[in-house]
């Protein structure tokens, strides 16, 4: 999980969203309207909206509100991780917004899940070096 992720306002431009994602090397941005958490914007949503083949408005005319996902998966920090993973897999979701006491505390992504699973596998099956075989 990435604690205290960068967020974007629903009224910000997609150009600003792209710059923010690029600068911080993230693929998901929680979306807020004022203090309220209202959804998530993914790099996939952004790329699709800015694809010239789709004939959408020029990028400077599009805003986060035009393309973000309003029904983001939001979980409390106490939610068991297996429940979160099952839901993400079943719904083909790339991220879960994590809250604590009703406030955004982090974002858990499919990349985070892969990293954790990789660490777990290495703890179970340590890598062998050529010297271990001899």
Regions found by a protein language model. Give the residues of each.
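The conserved cystathionine-beta-synthase
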Residues: 7-25, 32-33, 74-92, 98-99, ...
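Tandem CBS (Bateman) regulatory domains
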Residues: 1-4, 42-74, 80-89, 104, ...
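Short hydrophobic beta-strand motif reused across regulatory alpha/beta modules
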Residues: 27, 32, 40-44, 94, ...
């Amino acid at each position: 999980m990435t604690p205290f992720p960068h967020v974007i306002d629903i009224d910000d431009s997609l150009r600003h969203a792209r710059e923010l994602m690029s600068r911080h090397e993230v693929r998901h941005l929680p979306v807020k309207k004022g203090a309220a958490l209202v959804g998530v914007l993914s790099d996939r949503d952004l790329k699709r909206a800015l694809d010239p083949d789709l004939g959408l408005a020029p990028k400077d005319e599009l805003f986060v509100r035009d393309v973000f996902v309003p029904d983001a998966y939001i979980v409390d920090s106490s939610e068991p991780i297996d429940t979160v993973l099952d839901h993400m897999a079943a719904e083909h979701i790339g991220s879960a917004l994590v809250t604590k006491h009703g406030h955004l505390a982090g974002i858990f992504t499919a990349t985070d899940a892969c990293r954790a699973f990789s660490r777990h596998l290495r703890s179970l099956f340590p890598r062998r070096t050529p010297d271990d075989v001899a």
